[in-house]
Amino acid sequence: MKYFAIILLLIAQSCQKPIKTENASSYIFTWVKDENDWNSDYIAVINSNPNDRGYGSLVSTLPVGYSDINAHHSEHRFHEIKELFVNGFSGGRSFIVDLNEPENPKLKKTFTNIREYTFPHSFERLPSGNVLATFQTVGQGNNEVGGLVEISPDGDFVRSSNASDPQVAEFIRPYSLAILPEIDRVISTSADMKQKDLSNVVQVWRLSDLSLIKTM
């Protein structure tokens, strides 16, 4: 109920005229699902500068043009290029949002599969500025395990590595990830969003070549 209350508050605020802030230096960017799936999911920009007269107010919104896609994960941190990858998992669709002007956010690109990899889930920005993403599956349906896919800031394929591991019998569906560049590692977790089966593994990868080292 609390989740829906927050969404309802944001929806109510979105009906008001956006407020132009003065001397604002910080914002909260939220990726919001429409409660009833009637209207588009959207990015909401909120003024989080406690010294500004508009503190806590809705600055702007950006509908992405799709409803019933289950606004889900975004990048874990906001990168200096001020763009954000966000995911609508149920629709298998992701979006790149340009937030260089918080009062006027722009939809840069939308994408679904990247080559054979489908149903993107989580995103983590690499030191290079590229994004490393988990994709739950390969192909349509929920039959083949996905993997890690590196994507350029423009949403183009860079490289990939499959998460299947012939050394283990466990059901694998890549879920979230953490990047550890100082030790050349990536850690990914596993959970099946479509709930076909339990998926309780952790995988360790080499960041430099995306090779799978160990499934536990």
Positions of PLM-derived features:
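C-terminal motif of bacterial Sec signal peptides marking the signal peptidase cleavage site
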Residues: 11-14
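Residue-level detector of Asp-centered blade-edge/turn motifs that repeat once per structural unit
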Residues: 22-24, 78-81, 125-128, 180-183
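Beta-rich catalytic cores
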Residues: 24, 39, 70-73, 119, ...
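Short, solvent-exposed loop/turn segments at conserved positions within beta-propeller repeat blades
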Residues: 36-39, 89-92, 140-145, 193-200
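Short loop/turn segments immediately following beta-strands, especially the blade-tip
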Residues: 45-54, 96-105, 152-157, 204-213
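Blade-loop segments of beta-propeller domains
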Residues: 55-125
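Asp-box/WD-like beta-propeller blade repeats and closely related beta-sheet repeat scaffolds
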Residues: 99-182, 190-192
